[in-house]
Amino acid sequence: ATELGLKVALLDRRSHIGGNAYSENEEQTGIEVHRYGAHLFHTSNERVWEYVNRFTDFTNYVHRVYTRHDGVVYPMPINLGTINQFFNAAYSPAEAKALIAEQAGELAGTDPQNLNDKGISLIGRPLYEAFIKHYTAKQWQTPPEELPASIISRLPVRYTYDNRYFNDK
């Protein structure tokens, strides 16, 4: 709009702009408070990255997520490190892909009707039950067997040791 000399009207239902990315300085301390949680911006679109960098500086941050299963901590999303640690193995990427395909084939030839079966058909029962099933039930407050399969279309599995949650900027 600035480059074209256009005017923009911005409407927000809240008393401030910024949506969930809103932050404000706390009066007494001057500390910036993120009212709706931490702000993580990431994109793989170079034009978007260049555009937003015209307006602000970004702090380099790599988001990593870990989960616990049976008292052991694993990196997420599921990657080659997760697979090898979980199965106490040293699979190559090709071997890990073959293992997951074999385990996911348990429901081959069926049309998954719920999230539970869809998850198993995507990554196999062992990984699904260890890392997805209970988290999903907690997140949705509903057993995965009662959730529609359409909720998940894929479960990311990386066949590298890259354990960054987002693999873009």
Label every PLM stretch briefly.
Residues 29-106:
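Dinucleotide-binding Rossmann-like beta1-alpha1 core, especially the glycine-rich loop
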Residues 21, 45, 132:
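Short, flexible helix/strand-to-coil boundary loops that buttress conserved ligand/catalytic motifs
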Residues 18-19, 37, 124, 141:
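Glycine-centered flexibility sites
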Residues 2-27:
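Glycine-rich FAD pyrophosphate-binding loop
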Residues 70-72, 80-169:
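Active-site/ligand-binding neighborhood in enzyme catalytic cores
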